[in-house]
Amino acid sequence: MFAGLPSLTHEQQQKAVERIQELMAQGMSSGQAIALVAEELRANHSGERIVARFEDEDE
């Protein structure tokens, strides 16, 4: 479970995707780009936060 994840609007999500794609076009790996954008979102987000739980369905 992850606490304190930013709750993003569709527009904010779209901008994050575009930023990730931009970083990848500049040669960054997808994992690095996602991590960087996630860090930026956490640092700059001032809205609501959600609690998310991710489970592996293979178990």
UniProtKB/Swiss-Prot annotation:
InterPro entries: UPF0181
NCBIfam families: PRK05114.1
Family label: Belongs to the UPF0181 family.
Name assigned to this protein: UPF0181 protein YoaH
